[in-house]
Amino acid sequence: MRRWTLDEEGFTDDRVRYVMDSERLTDGEVPWLDDEPEARFRATYDVHAADTLTMSLTVVNTGDVPMSYEAALHSYLHVGDVSDAGLVGLRGATYLDATETGFPPRLQEPEAVTFGERPVDRVYYSDSSVQLRDAVLGRVVYIVKSGSPQTVVWNPGKEGDHMRCARPGEWRGFVAVEAAACRDRGVTLAPGESHTLSQTLSVETLDV
């Protein structure tokens, strides 16, 4: 029995990927990809880009016993300056605060989730759509999701200056907003069952 050391990105994060073939498809369809020849599931990731951007992950249990998994669609959204951006639509939702020991639950009381030099790393219990309002770029990014009981919100704050995967100051230019099904809201599939996690992004001008 093999064992993986799991990090916050899940067991697929450090798996080896192989380009087996490439083909330009009219509708942008991506063929399904199994984890391994002996896999007990099939995962298909579809991306449709036009006036809106839709991403969906469909997992099918191809095995003979129930399977459980967690998933999140990792959307890193560009902002002009994170200090002048706010995420609206989560007011009244409970969230787990991953910046504190034990992930204590908190209540989102302000209308907007705001960002600055302190890190924000939260799992919101909400299936609602949200809006990322960006005063610097003068736009609103609408995030509409389905099959997702949670929304993950992350920005490393000033700690991002010391991350290996980013240059100093880059943390000011993005917010991660992720449709998720994780922790106690993960997905359990009976044999033959499937689940689709999806989100659609659209952009409009911000009305001041």
Predicted regions and their residues:
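Short coil/turn motifs at secondary-structure junctions
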Residues: 23-25, 62-64, 80, 204-206
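A short beta-loop-beta micro-motif enriched in histidine and acidic residues
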Residues: 40-41, 70-73, 170
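Short Pro-Gly-centered flexible turn/kink motifs
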Residues: 57, 188-205
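Active-site/ligand-binding surface loops and adjacent short beta/alpha elements
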Residues: 66-68, 72-150
